[in-house]
Amino acid sequence: AEDCVGRKACTREWYPVCGSDGVTYSNPCNFSAQQEQCDPNITIAHMGEC
């Protein structure tokens, strides 16, 4: 869903990854939370900001 926000215990470390959904995630943990809980079809497009 558009308004879904995946949450799990992630550090605040800034190690950005760019998702295939065009969103910059602050680190791989936050990306995986979104993927697991909201959109299993997203992938990491590349490391770094989108």
Curated annotation (Swiss-Prot):
Keyword Disulfide bond appears in the UniProt entry = yes
Keywords from UniProt, A to Z, are: Disulfide bond, Glycoprotein, Protease inhibitor, Serine protease inhibitor
Which sites does the entry annotate for glycosylation? 30, 41
- InterPro entries found in the cross-reference section: Kazal_dom, Kazal_dom_sf
Q: Which cysteines are joined by disulfide bonds?
A: 10-29, 18-50
Q: Domain Kazal-like, which positions?
A: 2-50
- Gene Ontology molecular function: serine-type endopeptidase inhibitor activity
Site for Reactive bond, residues = 11-12
Q: What does this protein do?
A: Serine protease inhibitor. Strongly inhibits human neutrophil elastase and trypsin, also inhibits porcine pancreatic elastase and subtilisin A. Does not inhibit chymotrypsin, plasma kallikrein, pancreatic kallikrein, thrombin or papain.
- How is this protein named in the record? Protease inhibitor 2
The root-end lineage is: Eukaryota, Metazoa, Spiralia, Lophotrochozoa, Mollusca
